[in-house]
UniProtKB/Swiss-Prot annotation:
Transmembrane segments: none annotated. Keywords: Amino-acid biosynthesis, Cytoplasm, Histidine biosynthesis, Isomerase. It comes from Rhizobium meliloti (strain 1021) (Ensifer meliloti). The keyword Isomerase applies. It is an enzyme of class 5 (isomerase). GO terms for molecular function: 1-(5-phosphoribosyl)-5-[(5-phosphoribosylamino)methylideneamino]imidazole-4-carboxamide isomerase activity. It holds the Pfam family His_biosynth. Belongs to the HisA/HisF family. The gene is hisA. It is found in: Cytoplasm. This is 1-(5-phosphoribosyl)-5-[(5-phosphoribosylamino)methylideneamino] imidazole-4-carboxamide isomerase. The active site is at D8, D129. GO terms for biological process: L-histidine biosynthetic process; L-tryptophan biosynthetic process.
C-alpha cells in the first residue's frame, strides 16, 4: 500500500487540473524539482508525474522538468503522458525513471504494451482513464467505447507492473475516490491497481487501509495534498500501520 504524491506538469510548472480540463489549471509550484524534494522530505516513497502537455501532444513536452525532478529526488518516479513508442520508453527508462505509464497507446496498440513489458520487465504500467465507465484517450480529450475491465483484461499475463485507474469525473474536485469502480477493477484482474482521481481527505486514506482495499497497490493524491486536506505524516503513519497489520 503506497501513497503516491502527484506532480502534474503543464508548461514546465506543477499544476492541478479540474476534471482533466487544461483550461482549469491551478499552478501550485513553478519549480517541480523543488516540489519533488519536498515530497521526499515529507517521507513519501514514490513520485507520480504526468506530462499533461505531452498527453495532448503525443510526445514528451516537459522533458526538462522531468529531468530536473529525477535529479532532485532519490525516490523512484513513474511518468505518464505522451509516451507512445518503444523508443520513448527506452529513452525515459535510461534517463532514470523507475517505470513508464502507457495510456493512449494501451488502447490504440495493445501489442506495443505487451512488447514493452517483455523488453522492460516490471517497468511498464498501464494508465486507464475512464469517464462514465468508458476509457478516454488523448489526454482525456476523446472517449472510446471500450470498458475499463475489458481493456485491463487484455494485459493479463503480459507482465504489466500496475494499472493506474483514474476516474476523470472525480479528478481534481475532491469528491473522494470512486471506490466501487476501483475495487471492481481490482477484483477483475490480477494486475496490481493504483487508485487515482478524487482523493479528498483523511477519510479516503482510512478507506485505503480497510481490508477490502488492501488488494490495491496504493492511491495517488494531488490536490488534497497541495491544499493541506491531507496531513502527510498522519497519512503515511496510517498506511505504515496498515502494512504492519497485513504482515
Amino acid at each position: 500500500m503506497i501513497l503516491f504524491p502527484a506532480i502534474d506538469l503543464k508548461d514546465g510548472q506543477c499544476v492541478r487540473l479540474k476534471l482533466g480540463d487544461m483550461e482549469q489549471a491551478t499552478v501550485y509550484n513553478p519549480d517541480p524539482a523543488a516540489q519533488a524534494r519536498a515530497f521526499e522530505e515529507q517521507g513519501f516513497e514514490w513520485l507520480h508525474v504526468v506530462d499533461l502537455n505531452g498527453a495532448f501532444a503525443g510526445e514528451t513536452v516537459n522533458g526538462a522538468a522531468v529531468d530536473a525532478i529525477l535529479k532532485a529526488t532519490k525516490n523512484p518516479v513513474q511518468l505518464g503522458g505522451g509516451i507512445r513508442t518503444l523508443e520513448h520508453i527506452e529513452n525515459w527508462l535510461s534517463r532514470g525513471l523507475k517505470r513508464v505509464i502507457l495510456g493512449t497507446v494501451a488502447v490504440r496498440d495493445p501489442a506495443l504494451v505487451i512488447e514493452a513489458c517483455r523488453k522492460f520487465p516490471g517497468r511498464v504500467a498501464v494508465g486507464i482513464d475512464a469517464k462514465g465507465g468508458k476509457v478516454a484517450v488523448e489526454g482525456w480529450a476523446e472517449a472510446s467505447e471500450l470498458g475499463v475491465v475489458e481493456l485491463a483484461r487484455k494485459f493479463e499475463g503480459a507482465g504489466v507492473a500496475a494499472i493506474i485507474y483514474t476516474d476523470i469525473d472525480r479528478d481534481g474536485i475532491l469528491t473522494g475516490i470512486n471506490w466501487a469502480s476501483t475495487l471492481e477493477l481490482a477484483d477483475a484482474v490480477s494486475i496490481p491497481v493504483i487508485a487515482s482521481g478524487g482523493l479528498a481527505s483523511m477519510d479516503d486514506i482510512r478507506r485505503m487501509t480497510e481490508p477490502d482495499a488492501q488488494k490495491l497497490e496504493g492511491a495517488i493524491s494531488g490536490r488534497a495534498l497541495y491544499d493541506g486536506r491531507i496531513d502527510p505524516k498522519e497519512a503515511l503513519d496510517l498506511i505504515r500501520e496498515a502494512r504492519k497489520g497485513k504482515l
